[in-house]
UniProtKB/Swiss-Prot annotation:
Inducing stimuli: Not up-regulated by cytokinins.
UniProt family annotation: Belongs to the SNF2/RAD54 helicase family.
Role noted for this protein: Chromatin remodeling factor that represses the expression of embryonic trait genes (such as NFYB9/LEC1) upon and after seed germination and thus enables the developmental switch to post-germinative growth. Silences some MADS-box proteins such as PHE1 and PHE2. Plays a role during carpel differentiation. Regulates late processes in cytokinin signaling.
Example GO molecular function: hydrolase activity
Protein name: CHD3-type chromatin-remodeling factor PICKLE
Composition bias, Basic and acidic residues: 1316-1341, 1367-1384
Domain annotation Helicase C-terminal: ranges: 599-760
Amino acid sequence: MSSLVERLRIRSDRKPVYNLDDSDDDDFVPKKDRTFEQVEAIVRTDAKENACQACGESTNLVSCNTCTYAFHAKCLVPPLKDASVENWRCPECVSPLNEIDKILDCEMRPTKSSEQGSSDAEPKPIFVKQYLVKWKGLSYLHCSWVPEKEFQKAYKSNHRLKTRVNNFHRQMESFNNSEDDFVAIRPEWTTVDRILACREEDGELEYLVKYKELSYDECYWESESDISTFQNEIQRFKDVNSRTRRSKDVDHKRNPRDFQQFDHTPEFLKGLLHPYQLEGLNFLRFSWSKQTHVILADEMGLGKTIQSIALLASLFEENLIPHLVIAPLSTLRNWEREFATWAPQMNVVMYFGTAQARAVIREHEFYLSKDQKKIKKKKSGQISSESKQKRIKFDVLLTSYEMINLDSAVLKPIKWECMIVDEGHRLKNKDSKLFSSLTQYSSNHRILLTGTPLQNNLDELFMLMHFLDAGKFGSLEEFQEEFKDINQEEQISRLHKMLAPHLLRRVKKDVMKDMPPKKELILRVDLSSLQKEYYKAIFTRNYQVLTKKGGAQISLNNIMMELRKVCCHPYMLEGVEPVIHDANEAFKQLLESCGKLQLLDKMMVKLKEQGHRVLIYTQFQHMLDLLEDYCTHKKWQYERIDGKVGGAERQIRIDRFNAKNSNKFCFLLSTRAGGLGINLATADTVIIYDSDWNPHADLQAMARAHRLGQTNKVMIYRLINRGTIEERMMQLTKKKMVLEHLVVGKLKTQNINQEELDDIIRYGSKELFASEDDEAGKSGKIHYDDAAIDKLLDRDLVEAEEVSVDDEEENGFLKAFKVANFEYIDENEAAALEAQRVAAESKSSAGNSDRASYWEELLKDKFELHQAEELNALGKRKRSRKQLVSIEEDDLAGLEDVSSDGDESYEAESTDGEAAGQGVQTGRRPYRRKGRDNLEPTPLMEGEGRSFRVLGFNQSQRAIFVQTLMRYGAGNFDWKEFVPRLKQKTFEEINEYGILFLKHIAEEIDENSPTFSDGVPKEGLRIEDVLVRIALLILVQEKVKFVEDHPGKPVFPSRILERFPGLRSGKIWKEEHDKIMIRAVLKHGYGRWQAIVDDKELGIQELICKELNFPHISLSAAEQAGLQGQNGSGGSNPGAQTNQNPGSVITGNNNASADGAQVNSMFYYRDMQRRLVEFVKKRVLLLEKAMNYEYAEEYYGLGGSSSIPTEEPEAEPKIADTVGVSFIEVDDEMLDGLPKTDPITSEEIMGAAVDNNQARVEIAQHYNQMCKLLDENARESVQAYVNNQPPSTKVNESFRALKSINGNINTILSITSDQSKSHEDDTKPDLNNVEMKDTAEETKPLRGGVVDLNVVEGEENIAEASGSVDVKMEEAKEEEKPKNMVVD
């Protein structure tokens, strides 16, 4: 092994960048200093004496070291670079074909005949097979044609050469079968792009050359004579390396920060700016002069790149450099091209590529050579070199997001004059690595470029401003608090004033009046018969998932993904595409199988005839494959870009499509990869084959054609399958986008919930399953004839869109920043929208039941028929592999064909192998793996800190596992409750981790060891608690099974009821209700008491209220919305409660118009919920004790004959024989859990006093009196409250005293030095009008419930005075404990 390492260490670094023949040939040029054994020279009889063996001329010959041949260096193939090389051997001794880098082409070429005729005429050339080869260490300028016979001679000594030739021929066959024109050597590969360095060899200059479209790791040394035609590039190299290049005549008297406005396009720009672009340049210059960091947010296609280049060029004129531009990898070449067009005088370096390529850039493009010079000596003879900052060679560095993170150690030390971030909305997440890295870079000025600064909410816009100016926009929480009510005109104006200096936003319709219009048409298409068949089959096979109550959202997501695939094309499903050898028949089936493709075919044929060019966007790479098959059969020239195409290749394909007289008819693109920062204005038709969930992605795609440079009207066609999830998706996404820009203050990024998923999936299903005679199935079929297609494609009918989706954006927040007024929805409309949202949430609990019944009615018969057919097929042994798997059986069905493009762009496909592809963005759930078949096993532990994983489970996933285990137990070890909660994990992974976890908790407990026996840390896990909970839930599961298997038997035997008398039936609550309660624990999980209470299907709310002799209350949707907005402080007087019959239902706010009535309803509703939860919790705890005791009897084999040895006698003094008539004694432990009163001492008063105001002392005295009353009446008050009994006379008297003290405090606080007596009377509450009743229902004890001694009507007046004192009650943290009154 060591010898292998040593051999690898001494290998040459000059490896082929790529091999056309995919060879792994590792032969390299021998080192120059290699010594050869001295052997006797071979005497060749045909050697020419003192002459070149090739041309016959003498002088400057190179002699072979092993034979008598001699050659000129230029006559050799390949030419010899160094004629002075020692130990050189001629091609006859050593085959030069060992130095082949690539085989590029092969053809029959003429060569001179070896047979000389008798006449003096020129010998007749003969055609022989020759190969075009590129040599190692030489550029494409020095490629040579080598006859096949030379290869045949070399096969003897180089057996691998034969394999390389065979591989080349196989690849040539594939090229010949394609429609693309084959080019062996592209002209760009022999065109000098940049010269990096210079050296002198044997009196001749040589230059290190980078060629166009080749990366920096393919640079070659060329003699000056070989590149003599590229004098401009040679001169540019000399200028760049000249230290006087930047010595411009700058007016040093003028402060460079003084704003200088440009009235017309400046001379240093090699083009003409539009008026709005000139305005943008002035805005950027002004912002730079004021040191104000800004966002240039012009609409896509208005030339933000050009305006930015104009700014950097203006700064370059004043010797202000260097600048950093960060952009998506796919747009870097476009940036480079725009710099070359508009500001060719600037030295722009593009920094990206492999590690080797970046090393070349850093070595030759970053810094000038050191210029040693003497400085004023602080010490004798001290010499210093220029700082690296002063030696920076480039003016602008273009780089990608990945390089910012990957090479921050190189880029961060540089002090940048200006930093520009293209597609700046990527910085909306402050937790992203890009945001964190860029904040550490030093720059004098920062600019963000984005066409969509407000995609989701104001919080994201704030994060962009925080990146620009962390001082002015420091705290998101403060920003949210300051602008929480953004609909108020005053706040809108203030926000506008704050942001206006930082944001400029223009749209096409305002600044480009002469731009051709665009029109979007939504074309509704019917599914084909095959699509309908598979669409219905997906529903039928997943009947059990659809009817499952509370089914996992991941399952619905996967069903939706399968349906989306069917809408695109049924061939998207695995195994559906038939194998047809006849190409015409295969094409016919391809069209007939898909309604969309049939319409697309009709449109494309006419678009081709009319000379239009088309962009087709889709979400799926598989769909791109099908569209590619379609175009290939039609023999149409096309280009394709998806997430697998790298940055350089993308630009090549874009250039081919945009080239003058290009024969490319259409461009196939994935929406995410082909919708960002590229210019395809030569196309005038856009077809959105299937829509993106994010409408902004489709807007980006449309803007590729409708932008600067477009000369034709642009038609956009969006294909939607009628009555399918596509139609519903489009409706929801458009509605959400409109709402986003109407109610800016309410914007929050929300993932689609389960109700919306079911609504989307359900859409159109009834019509799909309806027969032709049913009413639901009578809607007419959509048919597009030739006349309809002609009308759709008639551009003379096109007018500019009145209100498109992107125009709606401008009706919202961003419209303010083109110097106009804000437009917002009014408060009433906002409140109505919020009420609709609350009402929708209130129906969510019933949604599962409605969903189940809907699908059961629609699919039950069909599912049963489907099962019968499968069983029948199985019985006949004809059952084939299912083409459509059930989502229930395979929770990952259909996710493998999703487009692999990233959420923002294709950046995962970096050209650097070291730069790993980024994960899935922001807003989209990562797709789960199907398993680890044929892969290496997951390591037990890996990573450190936050990245620490156990069997691939991170910290969050491990916590979710434990939480789920404590809630549902291990069940039957099928982990059914775990799979939907660990969406990133497969069942196999969960099962593997679960087995490991159970092994861990089964180990002998060692409290002194922080790890388990295998080294996995315990992470604070309380093993005893986990074991007890698992055992309890097993008992619950067994009890549920016992109840189901023995419906006539009691839940517990009589001896258990005698042991726990509280289990006996009450006046309302019976044994069957305990059965419901036990099942509810398994359904909702242990400890989820509120979920059990809220479960409408259980129907226990009214039962518990009747058992507790407490009225059942229901609230309206508006009141529930108000309830959620409460801070929990109460605000109503319980004494105002009216008499109700036990068990009656109170409907809140039915006839009440006053605010107090609504507050009362909310208070009683909250109190009812608290009591319900407390009852459920106590009841489950009692059932738990009974099950534990029953199991203990079985364990000890006592059978109820005697008491359990380890069990203390059960003492239940707090629970009577019946549920509803229990009496709870108040002990000292219960009182100790109440909040403590803390009287104010005289020393504290003196220490805090700031003046001699006697009123302050009086308030402290009143406060101490209140504390005394609370302490004296604590026990009696709590006793009355917890047992729902009327308070004693003493408590009522103390209550009236407390009321009097409160009035005195309010009187003191309402008096100020500058208030008149009349104003004092207005602001003081009229306490004499408060009627205090002494009934049990109307009065609560001092330490029970919520008591507010202020009168509702007087609260506003009191608040307007100097202050107020409210006496409130806080709920105890533990629900089983009573409540205490707290004085604020």
